[in-house]
């Protein structure tokens, strides 16, 4: 075979090779040269590229990736998110009065569905809802994460500490912004780049292992936070009496007669405030409060303390979370697991 013919064959093979390669997609260009775990979400409006925080929120990312790749038991061997829709969208593009977020990942398509299990939150201080393009878990309260997620249009700081942030948009925020309710998630492709990312697997075994680790981590964090809170309460309200229920109280004005007890109609003046002295409610804002003691109308700790008071008595009381608003908190003002204080005065008893 002569040299000229060999040269022609080589040139032809090079041309075929070049011509046969599809150009790199815009989504892949956005993450070219970057290490990490990424999700390319093909939607009715175009592609959204998400970087997943697999080192900071390993359980949540394992859940998302494992469902997307069909490797978790709940996915039944099929890509879980492919073909689902964005069932809840609040944005100007959707015809709403404000921009908020797009939400998807529900196989029921109405906000009630999930993978058939729930898992705990993974809150990380540096991962917050700071602006557009934050990928976060939708939930129905503490420890109720499943498959639903949302992506923000704007900063939503009121969701910090309530929803787990586990990723961010690195390309395609314009697609997020024009997504409308009912638009499809056609396909989710997981891309791993770099040695660490390529070693990150998301099988059912991985999920189960990380679930145990997160539960233990959260348990220790809760214990430490509780210990610090008790120390702060006892320092702030030094000299208070502590009841067996864990309520702290100080009588600031003695009352008259017998203790009120249960099934009495009482009227009280009050001021409620957090441990940072932020007032969340006060009878100064409206009329004094009238209720029947032991009637299930009030939070337990407040009711217990008023029953123990006398007419015209004043107390400062500090209630533990389990006798106040618990894990859920209240009104977007009282955080979950918060100690709260009241200044209370009984002004009428029937």
Q: What do the PLM-derived regions correspond to, one by one?
A:
Residues 3-7:
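N-terminal Sec-pathway targeting helices
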Residues 2, 20-350:
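Cross-family detector of peptidyl-prolyl cis-trans isomerase
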Residues 8-17:
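Bacterial N-terminal signal peptides
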